[in-house]
Protein backbone atom coordinates (compact mmCIF):
# COMPACT_ATOMS: atom_id res chain seq x y z
CA UNK A 1 0.00 0.00 0.00
CA UNK A 2 2.85 2.40 0.84
CA UNK A 3 4.46 1.71 -2.53
CA UNK A 4 1.17 2.44 -4.29
CA UNK A 5 0.94 5.73 -2.40
CA UNK A 6 4.39 6.77 -3.64
CA UNK A 7 3.48 5.82 -7.20
CA UNK A 8 0.29 7.87 -6.99
CA UNK A 9 2.12 10.90 -5.60
CA UNK A 10 4.74 10.67 -8.36
CA UNK A 11 2.01 10.63 -11.02
CA UNK A 12 0.33 13.78 -9.67
CA UNK A 13 3.52 15.66 -8.70
CA UNK A 14 3.14 19.37 -9.37
CA UNK A 15 -0.65 19.29 -9.69
CA UNK A 16 -2.67 21.47 -7.33
CA UNK A 17 -6.02 21.26 -5.61
CA UNK A 18 -8.16 24.32 -6.50
CA UNK A 19 -7.76 25.59 -2.93
CA UNK A 20 -3.97 25.54 -3.38
CA UNK A 21 -4.22 27.48 -6.63
CA UNK A 22 -6.48 30.05 -4.97
CA UNK A 23 -4.15 30.41 -1.98
CA UNK A 24 -1.13 30.81 -4.27
CA UNK A 25 -2.89 33.49 -6.30
CA UNK A 26 -3.78 35.40 -3.14
CA UNK A 27 -0.33 35.04 -1.58
CA UNK A 28 2.06 37.97 -1.63
CA UNK A 29 4.88 37.94 -4.18
CA UNK A 30 7.38 36.82 -1.54
CA UNK A 31 7.06 34.15 1.15
CA UNK A 32 10.25 34.22 3.21
CA UNK A 33 9.96 30.74 4.73
CA UNK A 34 9.09 29.05 1.44
CA UNK A 35 12.00 30.77 -0.26
CA UNK A 36 14.41 29.75 2.52
CA UNK A 37 13.23 26.14 2.24
CA UNK A 38 13.66 26.19 -1.53
CA UNK A 39 17.23 27.52 -1.25
CA UNK A 40 18.05 24.93 1.41
CA UNK A 41 16.92 21.91 -0.64
CA UNK A 42 18.73 23.25 -3.71
CA UNK A 43 21.93 23.54 -1.68
CA UNK A 44 21.53 19.98 -0.43
CA UNK A 45 20.75 18.62 -3.90
CA UNK A 46 23.85 20.32 -5.31
CA UNK A 47 26.10 19.14 -2.50
CA UNK A 48 24.88 15.54 -2.75
CA UNK A 49 25.53 15.50 -6.51
CA UNK A 50 29.04 16.92 -6.11
CA UNK A 51 29.86 14.38 -3.39
CA UNK A 52 28.41 11.61 -5.61
CA UNK A 53 25.85 10.72 -2.96
CA UNK A 54 23.29 11.00 -5.79
CA UNK A 55 23.99 9.77 -9.32
CA UNK A 56 22.09 12.74 -10.78
CA UNK A 57 20.67 16.05 -9.57
CA UNK A 58 17.80 15.00 -7.32
CA UNK A 59 15.15 17.42 -6.14
CA UNK A 60 14.07 17.16 -2.52
CA UNK A 61 10.92 18.49 -0.89
CA UNK A 62 10.93 22.08 0.34
CA UNK A 63 7.33 21.65 1.51
CA UNK A 64 8.46 18.86 3.86
CA UNK A 65 10.57 21.46 5.67
CA UNK A 66 7.59 23.83 5.82
CA UNK A 67 5.34 21.09 7.22
CA UNK A 68 7.80 19.98 9.90
CA UNK A 69 9.31 23.28 11.06
CA UNK A 70 8.70 23.81 14.75
CA UNK A 71 7.19 20.35 15.24
CA UNK A 72 8.64 18.25 18.03
CA UNK A 73 8.42 14.47 17.96
CA UNK A 74 6.32 13.25 20.88
CA UNK A 75 6.30 9.44 21.05
CA UNK A 76 3.54 9.57 23.67
CA UNK A 77 1.09 11.08 21.21
CA UNK A 78 1.87 8.92 18.21
CA UNK A 79 -1.18 7.05 16.95
CA UNK A 80 0.41 3.99 15.40
CA UNK A 81 -2.84 2.83 13.81
CA UNK A 82 -3.52 6.13 11.99
CA UNK A 83 0.12 6.29 10.89
CA UNK A 84 -0.30 3.20 8.72
CA UNK A 85 -0.97 3.55 4.99
CA UNK A 86 -4.38 1.92 4.65
CA UNK A 87 -7.41 2.61 2.50
CA UNK A 88 -9.36 3.51 5.65
CA UNK A 89 -6.76 6.07 6.77
CA UNK A 90 -6.52 7.61 3.30
CA UNK A 91 -10.30 8.03 3.14
CA UNK A 92 -10.38 9.46 6.67
CA UNK A 93 -7.71 12.01 5.78
CA UNK A 94 -9.56 13.05 2.61
CA UNK A 95 -12.84 13.39 4.51
CA UNK A 96 -11.31 15.46 7.31
CA UNK A 97 -8.96 17.66 5.29
CA UNK A 98 -9.84 17.74 1.59
CA UNK A 99 -13.53 17.06 1.08
CA UNK A 100 -14.50 19.19 4.10
CA UNK A 101 -14.06 22.93 3.49
CA UNK A 102 -11.63 24.45 5.99
CA UNK A 103 -11.98 28.11 6.92
CA UNK A 104 -8.59 28.30 8.58
CA UNK A 105 -6.08 26.59 6.30
CA UNK A 106 -2.37 26.94 5.72
CA UNK A 107 -2.52 30.72 6.00
CA UNK A 108 -3.59 30.47 9.63
CA UNK A 109 -0.85 27.94 10.30
CA UNK A 110 1.75 30.21 8.69
CA UNK A 111 0.77 33.09 10.96
CA UNK A 112 1.57 30.96 14.01
CA UNK A 113 5.01 29.94 12.79
CA UNK A 114 8.22 31.93 13.04
CA UNK A 115 9.87 32.89 9.76
CA UNK A 116 12.32 30.19 8.70
CA UNK A 117 15.88 30.90 7.64
CA UNK A 118 18.02 28.81 5.31
CA UNK A 119 20.02 27.72 8.36
CA UNK A 120 16.81 26.59 10.12
CA UNK A 121 15.84 24.53 7.09
CA UNK A 122 19.26 22.92 6.70
CA UNK A 123 19.35 21.96 10.38
CA UNK A 124 15.87 20.47 10.11
CA UNK A 125 16.98 18.41 7.10
CA UNK A 126 19.98 17.16 9.10
CA UNK A 127 17.61 16.12 11.90
CA UNK A 128 14.78 14.51 9.93
CA UNK A 129 16.15 13.72 6.47
CA UNK A 130 14.32 14.66 3.26
CA UNK A 131 11.83 12.94 0.95
CA UNK A 132 12.11 13.39 -2.80
CA UNK A 133 10.12 16.32 -4.15
CA UNK A 134 7.71 14.09 -6.09
CA UNK A 135 6.90 12.07 -2.96
CA UNK A 136 5.58 15.03 -0.97
CA UNK A 137 3.08 17.84 -1.45
CA UNK A 138 4.08 20.75 -3.69
CA UNK A 139 5.60 23.87 -2.15
CA UNK A 140 2.81 26.06 -0.82
CA UNK A 141 0.30 23.23 -0.36
CA UNK A 142 -2.57 24.38 1.87
CA UNK A 143 -3.31 20.94 3.32
CA UNK A 144 -1.47 19.53 6.31
CA UNK A 145 0.48 16.34 5.78
CA UNK A 146 -1.44 13.17 6.70
CA UNK A 147 -0.32 11.13 9.73
CA UNK A 148 0.78 8.28 7.44
CA UNK A 149 3.22 10.60 5.64
CA UNK A 150 5.75 9.38 8.20
CA UNK A 151 5.89 6.17 6.12
CA UNK A 152 7.23 8.03 3.07
CA UNK A 153 10.94 7.21 2.65
CA UNK A 154 13.43 9.96 3.46
CA UNK A 155 17.03 10.33 2.41
CA UNK A 156 19.22 10.78 5.50
CA UNK A 157 21.15 14.05 5.41
CA UNK A 158 23.99 14.52 7.89
CA UNK A 159 26.32 17.45 8.27
CA UNK A 160 26.67 20.95 9.63
CA UNK A 161 25.87 24.50 8.56
CA UNK A 162 28.89 26.71 7.89
CA UNK A 163 28.26 30.47 8.04
CA UNK A 164 30.64 33.22 6.94
CA UNK A 165 30.23 36.99 6.68
CA UNK A 166 32.62 38.12 3.94
CA UNK A 167 32.60 37.16 0.29
CA UNK A 168 36.31 36.32 0.44
CA UNK A 169 35.47 33.59 2.95
CA UNK A 170 32.43 32.57 0.93
CA UNK A 171 34.47 32.27 -2.25
CA UNK A 172 36.63 29.59 -0.62
CA UNK A 173 33.46 27.57 0.01
CA UNK A 174 32.11 28.28 -3.48
CA UNK A 175 35.12 26.53 -4.99
CA UNK A 176 33.62 23.26 -3.74
CA UNK A 177 29.85 23.76 -4.02
CA UNK A 178 27.09 26.38 -4.45
CA UNK A 179 26.41 28.52 -1.39
CA UNK A 180 23.43 30.32 0.09
CA UNK A 181 23.35 34.07 0.64
CA UNK A 182 21.05 37.06 0.99
CA UNK A 183 20.76 39.62 -1.79
CA UNK A 184 19.88 43.29 -1.33
CA UNK A 185 17.06 44.00 -3.78
CA UNK A 186 16.34 47.38 -5.32
CA UNK A 187 13.48 48.12 -7.67
CA UNK A 188 13.14 48.76 -10.57
CA UNK A 189 16.75 47.59 -11.08
CA UNK A 190 15.95 43.96 -10.23
CA UNK A 191 12.89 44.05 -12.50
CA UNK A 192 14.88 45.33 -15.47
CA UNK A 193 18.12 43.34 -15.12
CA UNK A 194 17.34 40.82 -17.90
CA UNK A 195 20.58 39.43 -19.35
CA UNK A 196 22.62 42.31 -17.93
CA UNK A 197 24.35 42.71 -14.56
CA UNK A 198 22.38 43.59 -11.45
CA UNK A 199 24.19 46.45 -9.71
CA UNK A 200 21.60 47.38 -7.13
CA UNK A 201 21.19 50.98 -6.11
CA UNK A 202 21.57 53.56 -8.87
CA UNK A 203 20.92 57.28 -8.94
CA UNK A 204 17.35 58.37 -9.50
CA UNK A 205 14.28 59.12 -7.45
CA UNK A 206 12.47 56.04 -8.77
CA UNK A 207 14.71 53.61 -6.90
CA UNK A 208 13.39 52.01 -3.72
CA UNK A 209 14.74 49.30 -1.44
CA UNK A 210 12.76 46.05 -1.56
CA UNK A 211 14.65 44.10 1.12
CA UNK A 212 16.88 41.07 1.57
CA UNK A 213 16.09 37.86 -0.29
CA UNK A 214 17.54 34.37 0.14
CA UNK A 215 19.39 33.23 -2.98
CA UNK A 216 21.78 30.52 -4.17
CA UNK A 217 25.17 31.48 -5.61
CA UNK A 218 26.05 28.94 -8.30
CA UNK A 219 29.39 30.32 -9.51
CA UNK A 220 31.55 33.39 -10.13
CA UNK A 221 32.72 34.56 -13.55
CA UNK A 222 33.95 37.59 -15.46
CA UNK A 223 31.41 39.49 -17.55
CA UNK A 224 32.24 42.66 -19.49
CA UNK A 225 35.16 43.46 -17.21
CA UNK A 226 33.25 42.92 -13.97
CA UNK A 227 33.35 40.02 -11.53
CA UNK A 228 29.81 38.71 -11.19
CA UNK A 229 28.08 36.00 -9.20
CA UNK A 230 25.63 33.76 -11.03
CA UNK A 231 22.68 33.77 -8.65
CA UNK A 232 19.51 31.69 -8.58
CA UNK A 233 16.65 33.77 -7.21
CA UNK A 234 12.91 33.47 -6.72
CA UNK A 235 11.41 36.89 -7.42
CA UNK A 236 7.72 37.57 -7.92
CA UNK A 237 7.09 33.80 -7.78
CA UNK A 238 9.47 33.10 -10.68
CA UNK A 239 12.80 31.27 -10.52
CA UNK A 240 15.63 32.63 -12.64
CA UNK A 241 19.40 33.03 -12.82
CA UNK A 242 20.81 36.57 -12.78
CA UNK A 243 24.29 38.10 -12.79
CA UNK A 244 25.10 40.12 -9.65
CA UNK A 245 28.02 42.52 -9.51
CA UNK A 246 30.59 41.73 -6.84
CA UNK A 247 32.25 45.14 -7.04
CA UNK A 248 29.30 47.31 -6.01
CA UNK A 249 29.22 48.67 -2.46
CA UNK A 250 26.82 51.20 -1.02
CA UNK A 251 26.17 53.17 2.16
CA UNK A 252 22.44 53.80 2.30
CA UNK A 253 19.25 52.69 0.67
CA UNK A 254 16.93 55.65 1.23
CA UNK A 255 16.75 59.40 0.83
CA UNK A 256 13.59 60.10 2.84
CA UNK A 257 15.28 60.75 6.19
CA UNK A 258 14.23 57.45 7.75
CA UNK A 259 17.37 56.40 9.64
CA UNK A 260 16.04 52.88 10.12
CA UNK A 261 16.59 52.30 6.40
CA UNK A 262 20.28 53.19 6.51
CA UNK A 263 22.76 50.35 6.55
CA UNK A 264 26.52 49.99 6.91
CA UNK A 265 28.78 49.81 3.83
CA UNK A 266 28.10 46.47 2.21
CA UNK A 267 28.12 44.48 -0.98
CA UNK A 268 24.95 43.31 -2.64
CA UNK A 269 25.44 39.74 -1.36
CA UNK A 270 25.70 39.13 2.40
CA UNK A 271 25.20 36.45 5.10
CA UNK A 272 26.65 33.40 3.36
CA UNK A 273 26.01 29.80 4.42
CA UNK A 274 26.58 26.32 3.09
CA UNK A 275 25.73 22.76 4.18
CA UNK A 276 28.89 20.76 4.80
CA UNK A 277 27.64 17.22 4.33
CA UNK A 278 29.07 14.13 5.92
CA UNK A 279 29.55 11.14 3.64
CA UNK A 280 29.75 8.66 6.50
Swiss-Prot record:
GO terms for cellular component: cytoplasm; nucleus. The keyword Nucleus applies. This is Protein HEAT-INDUCED TAS1 TARGET 4. Induction: Target of TAS1 (trans-acting siRNA precursor 1)-derived small interfering RNAs in response to temperature variations. Up-regulated by cold (at 4 degrees Celsius), but rapid drop of expression after a temperature shift to room temperature (at 22 degrees Celsius). Highly up-regulated in seedlings exposed to heat shock. Its main location: cytoplasm. Keywords: Cytoplasm, Nucleus. It is found in: Cytoplasm; Nucleus. Belongs to the heat induced plant HTT protein family. One of its GO terms (biological process) is heat acclimation. It comes from Arabidopsis thaliana. Expressed in seedlings, leaves, stems, inflorescences and siliques. Mediates both basal and acquired thermotolerance. Transmembrane segments: none annotated.
Amino acid sequence: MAERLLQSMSRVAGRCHPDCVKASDEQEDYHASQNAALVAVNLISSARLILKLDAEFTEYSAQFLMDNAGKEDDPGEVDQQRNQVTTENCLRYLAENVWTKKENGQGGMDQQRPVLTVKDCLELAFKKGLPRREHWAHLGCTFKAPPFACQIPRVPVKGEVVEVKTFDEAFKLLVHQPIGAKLHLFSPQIDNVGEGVYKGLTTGNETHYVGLRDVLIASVEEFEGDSVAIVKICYKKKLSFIKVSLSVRFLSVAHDGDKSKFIAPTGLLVDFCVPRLSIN
